[in-house]
């Protein structure tokens, strides 16, 4: 068996009995949160244990009685989704910090200061989160927590989630490849091809991403694009 830090224990109690599996920390966390990784990559081994520390394996009979199946993959999937993941303090600290950064990044990209209509710097959002003592949940997705955080932060600073509608005009020769590029930046609400070959479009984006998206559009058009904020709501 590998060094202890290479794996962690995920466990679940069923009918008074504890069942454990060995998993890779980062992938197990991601699997539990998003389910977008292969179970094979998450599992260190497909053995089902009663007690990993003692090396005590669960018998197929007691596994089937507890889970209705003795298939280790199906059992492991249930443990990961419904059970607990036993993190070390360092792993928990690192994952909490990563989640905190995701929340801050989401707010910075999607929120504005309603008194100015401008994006809010991440440092200011971070300070506000600390001020309101927002409790970060390791197992919940960043987006839903960010929405809750904005409600709390609004008590100590002007902030709201918003969408911005940009009016964009891109002249030839850059207009030909512009439409697909704009679709990757946001939601194209309207697009028209002008007689001179220019593309005129309305692009909806997260309000906090105005500077970033405008910069990307100008890079696409070699600085020749016209970008105006039509509405922030």
Curated annotation (Swiss-Prot):
UniProt record, GO biological process: cytosolic ribosome assembly
Similarity comment: Belongs to the SDO1/SBDS family.
Protein name: Ribosome maturation protein SDO1 homolog
Organism: Aeropyrum pernix (strain ATCC 700893 / DSM 11879 / JCM 9820 / NBRC 100138 / K1)
